[in-house]
Regions:
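Bacterial N-terminal signal peptides that target proteins for export
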Residues: 1-8
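Bacterial N-terminal signal peptides
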Residues: 8-17
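Extracellular carbohydrate-recognition regions
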Residues: 21-38, 173-199
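Short carbohydrate-recognition loop motifs
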Residues: 46-66
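Extracellular ligand-binding interfaces
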Residues: 61-137, 157
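Extracellular beta-strand elements of beta-rich domains used
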Residues: 146, 162-166
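Short beta-strand-plus-loop segments that form exposed binding edges in beta-rich domains
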Residues: 148-155
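Conserved small/polar residues in nucleotide/adenosyl-binding loops
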Residues: 203-210
């Protein structure tokens, strides 16, 4: 009985400690997070597309637009942990052969790492990527802001973001796909790793709209 109680207390403590350092931006409050801004476009909380709940962040962007996210919740702890990084779901309306570029910057505005994400699809795609392990960020770096840079040659587009999180522990199931690359190469440890990962996604992911 005491052993079971200790396990329960430990699990609760872990959950609380994780919530202190990490927050999932699910956009269910119905308003754009404070300080988020785009220089060429419009940010809107929308119920048109969503991965969880009933809302997501709709971004109507124009050529060369930049969305700036200052001091995102959880980013400091994510930087300090070798497994820290970013999780997100992206919905793209019109496929293009250009990238959405996540640029991570320190207090001076210098880029410390980046993640190109190819927009050649329509629908939802996920991102699970580590700052140090996948984006080659130095362990001494500290991220203060995030820039999401939109295509340079495509005139305009609409993209949605949901369940954005800067976390101290990116899932071990992360792997490269058509949209972005990670440095993981040990998939052979699990037979049919891709089938296993996709099964986990189906089990753990909420039912999306579209």
């Amino acid at each position: 009985m005491k052993k079971n109680l200790s396990i329960v207390i430990l699990l609760i403590s872990l959950a609380i400690s994780q919530s202190v350092f990490s927050q999932t931006y699910s956009f269910e409050k119905g308003k754009v997070p404070e300080g988020w801004k785009i220089d060429k476009g419009v940010l809107h909380i929308s119920s048109e597309k969503y991965k969880s709940g009933s809302r997501s962040l709709q971004i109507k962007w124009k050529q060369n637009a930049v969305l700036t996210i200052p001091s995102p919740t959880g980013i400091s702890e994510a930087c300090r942990n070798r497994n820290g990084g970013m999780n997100a779901w992206i919905y793209n309306e019109s496929p293009t052969k250009e990238n959405l570029l996540f640029s991570f910057r320190d207090e001076t505005g210098k880029e410390v790492c980046q993640l190109p994400f190819l927009l050649d699809f329509k629908g939802w795609r996920c991102i699970w990527a580590k700052f140090q392990g996948d984006m080659n960020m130095s362990s001494k770096s500290n991220i203060q802001s995030v820039e999401i840079q939109f295509p340079q040659h495509t005139k305009k587009g609409v993209t949605y973001i949901d369940l954005l999180e800067f976390t101290s522990k990116v899932s071990w199931q992360n792997m490269s796909d058509a949209q972005y690359k990670v440095n993981r190469t040990d998939y052979s440890l699990i037979p049919d790793f891709i089938g296993y990962r996709n099964a986990c996604l189906l089990y753990t992911s909420p039912s999306p709209r579209d």
